[in-house]
């Protein structure tokens, strides 16, 4: 379960929105295209902010994979990565997830690359 307050979409809803089967969703988690979290009840899901409306329907937030990879390389667990994404960072003056959804992924990734444990 994540320690930050976020809206979580259940995995079946994510699969429906993306038009994929659950096994493909698991691959997206492994490839760090999406990140899996648990809601308050312990059910698996995906943060709502990382599924966005694209030109061809719903899709994973395009800039998320690079950031998740950097955070994993820095030693972050999935839960730590979610906490970092959803907590205001002084260097950004906002939450990294907000910067990513606004197209400022270069700045987010520059900061993420300095976070190695």
Name the predicted role of every residue range.
Residues 1-117:
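Non-transmembrane "mature" sequence context
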């Amino acid at each position: 379960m994540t320690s930050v307050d976020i809206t979580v979409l259940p995995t079946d809803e994510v699969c429906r929105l993306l038009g994929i089967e659950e096994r493909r969703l698991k691959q997206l988690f492994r490839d760090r295209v999406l990140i899996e979290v648990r809601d308050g009840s312990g059910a698996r899901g995906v943060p709502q902010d990382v599924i966005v409306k694209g030109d061809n329907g719903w899709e994973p937030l395009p800039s998320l994979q690079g950031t998740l990879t950097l955070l994993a390389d820095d030693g972050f667990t999935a839960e730590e990565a979610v906490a970092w994404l959803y907590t205001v960072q002084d260097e950004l003056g906002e939450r990294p997830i907000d910067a990513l959804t606004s197209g400022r992924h270069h700045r987010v990734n520059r900061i993420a690359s300095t976070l190695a444990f």
